[in-house]
Amino acid sequence: VLTFGFTLLTSDIAIGRRTQKSAIGAYAEMKPKWKFLGILTFLVPVLIMTYYAVIGGWITKYAVVYLTGQAKAAAADDYFTSFITSSTSPVIFALIFMGVTAFIVYNGVQDGIEKVSKWMMPVLLVLVVIISIYSLTLKHTDSSGQVHTGIQGFLYYLTPNLEGLTVQRFLQILLDAMSQLFFSLSVSMGIMITYGSYVKPDVDLNKAVNQIEIFDTGVAFLAGAMIIPAA
């Protein structure tokens, strides 16, 4: 995040601000022969959307379930399995999710994405904080009778385990971290180039990128604190 992430994110936003265009147009303006790079970066979010639509459909389904007062039914062990194995329900909710997403994107960055994000992101952040705190209060007893608490899970989450670390495993961890970096910061996907085209010339890019990285890392940490202690 502090090295590759900062450099790549700054580059993407700077390209967008300089050219005032989306990925395909930006690369073409810098050099016509580079237009294919813009096309490749455009294809990345298209591919990502293929499974985002599925996961978004799951979230939409559970949102409807909870809003209609069926939370207890959704907590059953076989509820999720029966939903995803249905021949119609996952498709319907994925289409609903895609329809809402398409409507927001159709309205553009400022009138669509920005307006929705201004209220959606704070709500999601508050929910993540609440669930993270709740995860710390959980505890369960395993088959041997030993009690495991959320605090123990949180400490496990924070404690590095260097046992059995080899060069090969270290390189794999590094590769995984790089993959997470590209995905989390949305670099080299054309997304930040498009956002960069809306950045005003007087904005300090170094400061803006630092803020993005701090917020991104903070949310990632909270996501881990939300999931791992509960596991």
Model-inferred region functions:
Residues 11-21, 202:
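Membrane-interface helix-loop junction between the first two transmembrane segments
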Residues 5, 16-18, 48-54, 181-188:
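Short helix-coil transition sites and intra-membrane helix breaks within transmembrane domains
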Residues 1-11, 37, 89-90:
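Extracellular loop-to-transmembrane helix junctions
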Residues 11, 56, 109, 190-191:
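Hydrophobic/aromatic residues in alpha-helical transmembrane segments
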Residues 2-6, 40-61, 123-136, 215-226:
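Hydrophobic alpha-helical membrane-insertion segments
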Residues 118-231:
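Membrane-embedded translocation segments of transport machinery
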Residues 21-40, 53-112, 139-175:
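Inter-helical loop and helix-membrane interface segments of multi-pass membrane transporters/permeases
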